[in-house]
């Protein structure tokens, strides 16, 4: 999974925690 702070898309679940919609980053 992607570590916190990594860029992500809210529609994908590849973060270790969750993708934050306000900054489009994990964690």
Swiss-Prot record:
InterPro entries: Conotoxin_omega-typ_CS (IPR012321). It is found in: Secreted. Disulfide bonds join 1-16, 8-19, 15-26. Keywords: Calcium channel impairing toxin, Disulfide bond, Hydroxylation, Ion channel impairing toxin, Knottin, Neurotoxin, Presynaptic neurotoxin, Secreted, Toxin, Voltage-gated calcium channel impairing toxin. One of its GO terms (molecular function) is calcium channel regulator activity. It comes from the Eukaryota. GO terms for cellular component: extracellular region; host cell presynaptic membrane. Its main location: secreted. Expressed by the venom duct. PROSITE patterns: OMEGA_CONOTOXIN. The modification 4-hydroxyproline is found at residues 4, 7. Omega-conotoxins act at presynaptic membranes, they bind and block voltage-gated calcium channels (Cav). Belongs to the conotoxin O1 superfamily. The presence of a 'disulfide through disulfide knot' structurally defines this protein as a knottin. The cysteine framework is VI/VII (C-C-CC-C-C). This is Omega-conotoxin RVIA. It comes from Conus radiatus (Rayed cone).
């Amino acid at each position: 999974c992607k570590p916190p702070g990594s860029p992500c898309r809210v529609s994908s679940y590849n973060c270790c925690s969750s993708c934050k919609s306000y900054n489009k980053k994990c964690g």
